[in-house]
Amino acid sequence: SPGALEDEHNDNFLRF
């Protein structure tokens, strides 16, 4: 996701 940190699936905050 656009905004995910260097984590493959860290869309916990930019998942809008």
UniProtKB/Swiss-Prot annotation:
Keywords: Amidation, Neuropeptide, Secreted. The keyword Secreted applies. GO terms for biological process: neuropeptide signaling pathway. It is found in: Secreted. Its main location: secreted. GO terms for cellular component: extracellular region. It comes from the Eukaryota. The modification Phenylalanine amide is found at F16. Belongs to the FARP (FMRF amide related peptide) family. FMRFamides and FMRFamide-like peptides are neuropeptides. This is Extended FMRFamide-12. It comes from Mantophasma kudubergense (Gladiator). The lineage of its organism: Eukaryota, Metazoa, Ecdysozoa, Arthropoda, Hexapoda.
